[in-house]
Amino acid sequence: VEILKCHLKKQGESIWNFANGRDTSLVESESQGNKGYGNSTTIAFDVTDEGTAKMVLLSLCETVAARLRKDDVKAEVVSVSVRDFEMKTVSHQRVMAAPTNITGEIYDTVCVLFDELWDGMPIRHLGVHTSRVSKEERGRQMSLFDLNTNYEKMEKMDMAVDKIRKKFGNNAIMRASFLDNKKVENMTG
């Protein structure tokens, strides 16, 4: 240490401390929030039809949106990734009109992205990811095409479903499309 301090002054001591795993900076107790939320699954069988693929995507959207709501945040960017049986992965993303944590809204965007992305190859892995996450509540820009959509009602319904699942388990309440489907669980991941 003394030789380094003699030649490099204060920097010599810092270099010696770093080289020996010593750090005098304060430990930050507050952790950074998540920058994104996502979920993906490797499917036990090759998915060759759009219906099954969209069921898996719905299941992934359920878990991602529930995690967003649990942390009281909304995401502005949604992305989908698809890996085929040859292990080739492709993905697309889209910026939403407004940040959201509503399952149906995320799922609708995911379906559009999937339709743009999938070329019909057998699917082995699917993923849904969100980013540009924020806590602040921004106003939603009204659209002529959304006049009949009650986002507040959809959000309250999703939160009620979350409470039921938290109290009674993930299978206590599920979408009807999962009832007869033995291949895909209602909450994947």
Question: What label would you give each PLM region?
Answer:
Residues 1-122:
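DNA-contacting surface of Y-family translesion DNA polymerases
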Residues 96-189:
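Acidic, metal-coordinating catalytic segment for phosphate/diphosphate chemistry
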